[in-house]
Every structure is written in structure tokens, then in C-alpha cells.
Amino acid sequence: MQNNEEPFSKTRSSGQHPSGVHGKKSPRLPKCARCRNHGYASPLKGHKRFCMWRDCQCKKCSLIAERQRVMAAQVALRRQQAQEEELGISHPIPLPIAAELLIKREHGGSSSCLMLESSSTQTTSTSTSGSTTSSEGKMLIQEIPSITSRGHLESTSDLVMDSPYYSNFYQPPLYPYYNNLYNYPPYQMAVATESTSGNDMGGISGPSMKNSHRNHPAAYVPSQSGNQWQMKNGENRFPGHSASSQFRMHSYYPPYLGQSVPNPVCVPPFLTFEEIPSYSEAKASVALSPPSSQDSGIISLSSNSPVSNESTKGAAEQEPNSESSAFTVTTAGEDRE
């Protein structure tokens, strides 16, 4: 190996003079330090894996190994600091006048703000060692005229996160049952589904009404006022009638913030399926009201419609069935008494 490496150095030294220009020299090639310590000159490029003294423990080679460890630690430290600066979590920018404790007093303000620079846990030991030794045990009192004249202090506020401000976004809601913006009530609907003929409406009761209502949830949509339900189908049999207070249904979606927001406490209780009277008793209670009133029920029909003649016959046949039902029914007049 000595024969191959020595001529390389000779040809390199001899090749400098034949060149006509003395000012320009070929760049110096790096050599292996371990081989140089043992008297050999070998180029470093591609030689590290094949060096004969890479595991040598002599005094000179041990110094080389120690220097390599120190340089590797410095490179790793610089790389970590660069990553922290990119992520924005580096330590605050030190003030021009290094002070361990800074007391700031505003104009006419009795309270003073204390800033302890050594309380930052993200500062590295190398960056804080110089400032702590030079300013240890010193206190500086600085009068600041106004907030706008802080200068360099404004740049430090960008790096410090205001924890009370950001913690407001993650507070649990006041009503854990409702997890939306408007605190909607649970979806409950106590409106009888529409049947094909008028005489079928009196026969629906109890569980059958619940099952049929689940199959047709989209037959009713909230009106523009948001206080009652209207039919969505094309055959709207009751265009001029509005729902009475007994059959009036509150919509699922409350009005927007521009209107008056309903309070869930003040909403009247929803009617269950057992509390809805049958068609025949509702017909009898509505017949007592004057014909000019607009407060007739959803299930009631006008006297001029041809469907009412057919429905009255079916209601007369189903009166005994409604009286023998398991649950009790109260009309609107009895509730008011």
C-alpha cells in the first residue's frame, strides 16, 4: 500500500511545475488523518471504509475520534435548533439589555408586570449560560411610556401562545346533551300520518300509528313560521285550515337568530300518541265551534267537501271501537275546564 500511495503524492507535486501558469494550482485533496499519523498519505475520498487504522486506539487516533464525536454533537444541536425555529417553538428573543428580572410599569398603572427570562423551559443550556452569568442577581426597572412604544417586545408576542384565549375553544358545552349550535330539542313528532281515505284516520291508534309514522317521516315539513306542520303531498285537502292549539305541532328546527329564539323551557309538552283523540271525538268537539272560526283541527274537514260525507259514515261505525279502547281520551274542551 505504501508503494501505491507514495507515487501519488510525487506525481501530484511534480505535476504542479510543468503547468505554464504558476498562480493556478490544483485543489488540495483531503487525506486520511489516521493514515497520516502512521506515515501514509492516502486520499480520503472512498477510503474511510477501507482504512487500516479506523479502529486504532493509539494516542493520536483517539484524539481524532474525540474530535469527531464533538463535531457530531454540534451538528445535531444546530439541526435541532433549526427545527425548533421552523416550528415556532424557539425561546423568546433576548432583550438588548440582558436582565434576569424585568419590571415594566405603564403610564398611570399601579400594577407592574414581571417577566422572568429564566422561567422558559424551552431555552437551551448553551444559549442561556452566557446571559445568566453576566446578569445574575441584577434587577432592572424600566419606565415604558405606552404600549405602542415597546419596539422589540412586539416580536416576542408572536412566539408566545396565549393559553386562556385558546382554551376557550375547547371548553365543554353548557348542555352536554345537545352538541350542536342551536341546542335543538330531540326529534319528537306526534302528528298522525295521512291515509288514503278519510274513514281510515279514526282507526289508527297506539303502536300501529307509531309504526306507520316511522315509515312516512318526510310527509310533513315545517312551515315558514316554524310553529306548525304542513302537508307536503300534492293533494292538500285542508288549504284554508290551520292547526288548533290541541293538534299544533312545534317544528324541529327553531327560527334563525334574526327572529326570536325559542326557549326550550317554555315549549309546551309534546302530545303522545295515546293522548291524541280519535277522529270521531275530534269531529264532535269541532262541530261545537262556530263555522267562521279558523281554529279547526288538522283532522277536521269542511262541510262542503265530498270527503266529509263519507267520513261521517265511517265515524259513526267506529264510535263503539273508540269507546272500548284501552286508553282514555280527553277533548280540548275538557282540558280547558
UniProtKB/Swiss-Prot annotation:
Gene3D superfamilies recorded: DM DNA-binding domain
Signal peptide (UniProt feature, chain positions): none
GO MF term (any one): metal ion binding
Primary location recorded for the protein, binned into one broad class: nucleus
Gene Ontology CC: nucleus
Regions of compositional bias (Polar residues) in chain numbering: 1-17, 319-331
Chain positions covered by the region annotation Disordered: 1-28, 113-136, 287-337
Low complexity bias (residue ranges): 113-135, 292-311
InterPro entries per UniProt: DM_DNA-bd (IPR001275), DM_DNA-bd_sf (IPR036407), DMRT (IPR026607), DMRT1-like (IPR022114)
Family label: Belongs to the DMRT family.
Function: Transcription factor that plays a key role in male sex determination and differentiation by controlling testis development and germ cell proliferation. Acts both as a transcription repressor and activator.
Protein name as annotated: Doublesex- and mab-3-related transcription factor 1
Organism: Xenopus tropicalis (Western clawed frog)
